[in-house]
């Protein structure tokens, strides 16, 4: 698994959040294809936007920031151009880098939208009973996944309205209505039938028929 520590400046900033991942070089002029973790790329990826980089310590980009010069779309795929990334070699050195940013202080909160740091640490309730705590948020193209730590292990919960109908950041809680089996073992629907009174009373075979 390709994993690197989150940059220290991001750790110190609880408002920071991930907006994308650089996947691979595109063309010869330093462009890099993007995997987006935001549903509003036109707002996050504007010329001049600055990103902190989550990369290995051995990367030449470790401890540096990246500034966007332009975002283009090729066949419905986002491609970014950045200051200091002038050719394919430089673009390839950024493959798998995760982009973090901090929203402007005057940015208005959107309804039913939360940053990762607002979700991590929330108490998860099911039918009013605490079942775990959110420990991590994973972002995927289809949907986001909440990692919920429970006494029996970590449960991955799809962050969709049908399963997570309510989030109350001020109260520190998140309500789940999970399908059967997500937080517990699915019961055996075909239990072994108990013997009838006649079968229970039948004596054990003797002699050559006994086994």
From Swiss-Prot:
<dbReference type="GO" id="GO:0042274">
    <property type="term" value="P:ribosomal small subunit biogenesis"/>
</dbReference>
<dbReference type="InterPro" id="IPR011961">
    <property type="entry name" value="RimM"/>
</dbReference>
<feature type="domain" description="PRC barrel">
    <location>
        <begin position="111"/>
        <end position="182"/>
    </location>
</feature>
<dbReference type="InterPro" id="IPR011033">
    <property type="entry name" value="PRC_barrel-like_sf"/>
</dbReference>
<protein>
    <recommendedName>
        <fullName>Ribosome maturation factor RimM</fullName>
    </recommendedName>
</protein>
<feature type="region of interest" description="Disordered">
    <location>
        <begin position="184"/>
        <end position="211"/>
    </location>
</feature>
<dbReference type="GO" id="GO:0005840">
    <property type="term" value="C:ribosome"/>
</dbReference>
<comment type="function">
    <text>An accessory protein needed during the final step in the assembly of 30S ribosomal subunit, possibly for assembly of the head region. Essential for efficient processing of 16S rRNA. May be needed both before and after RbfA during the maturation of 16S rRNA. It has affinity for free ribosomal 30S subunits but not for 70S ribosomes.</text>
</comment>
<dbReference type="Pfam" id="PF24986">
    <property type="entry name" value="PRC_RimM"/>
</dbReference>
<keyword id="KW-0690">Ribosome biogenesis</keyword>
<feature type="compositionally biased region" description="Low complexity">
    <location>
        <begin position="189"/>
        <end position="204"/>
    </location>
</feature>
<dbReference type="GO" id="GO:0043022">
    <property type="term" value="F:ribosome binding"/>
</dbReference>
<keyword id="KW-0698">rRNA processing</keyword>
<keyword id="KW-0143">Chaperone</keyword>
<comment type="subunit">
    <text>Binds ribosomal protein uS19.</text>
</comment>
<dbReference type="Pfam" id="PF01782">
    <property type="entry name" value="RimM"/>
</dbReference>
<dbReference type="InterPro" id="IPR056792">
    <property type="entry name" value="PRC_RimM"/>
</dbReference>
<keyword id="KW-0963">Cytoplasm</keyword>
<dbReference type="GO" id="GO:0006364">
    <property type="term" value="P:rRNA processing"/>
</dbReference>
<dbReference type="InterPro" id="IPR002676">
    <property type="entry name" value="RimM_N"/>
</dbReference>
<dbReference type="InterPro" id="IPR009000">
    <property type="entry name" value="Transl_B-barrel_sf"/>
</dbReference>
<comment type="similarity">
    <text>Belongs to the RimM family.</text>
</comment>
<dbReference type="InterPro" id="IPR036976">
    <property type="entry name" value="RimM_N_sf"/>
</dbReference>
<dbReference type="GO" id="GO:0005737">
    <property type="term" value="C:cytoplasm"/>
</dbReference>
């Amino acid at each position: 698994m390709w994993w690197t520590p989150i940059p220290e400046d991001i750790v110190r900033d609880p408002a920071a959040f991930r907006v994308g991942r650089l996947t691979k070089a595109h063309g010869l002029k330093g462009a890099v294809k993007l995997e987006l973790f935001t549903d509003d790329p036109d707002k996050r990826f504007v010329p001049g936007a600055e990103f902190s980089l989550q990369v290995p310590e051995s990367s030449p980009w470790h401890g540096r920031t990246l500034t966007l010069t332009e975002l283009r779309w090729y066949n419905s795929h986002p491609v970014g151009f950045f200051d200091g990334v002038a050719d394919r070699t430089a673009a390839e050195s950024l493959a798998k880098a995760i982009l973090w940013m901090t929203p402007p202080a005057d940015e208005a909160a959107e309804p039913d939208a939360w940053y990762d740091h607002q979700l991590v640490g929330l108490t998860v309730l099911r039918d009013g009973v605490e079942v775990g705590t959110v420990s991590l948020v994973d972002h995927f193209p289809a949907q986001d996944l909440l990692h919920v730590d429970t006494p029996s292990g970590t449960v991955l919960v799809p962050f969709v309205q049908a399963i997570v109908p309510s989030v109350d950041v001020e109260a520190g809680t998140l309500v789940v209505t999970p399908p059967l089996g997500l937080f517990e073992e699915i019961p055996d629907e075909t239990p072994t039938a108990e013997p009838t009174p006649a079968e229970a009373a039948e004596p054990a075979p003797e002699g050559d028929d006994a086994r």
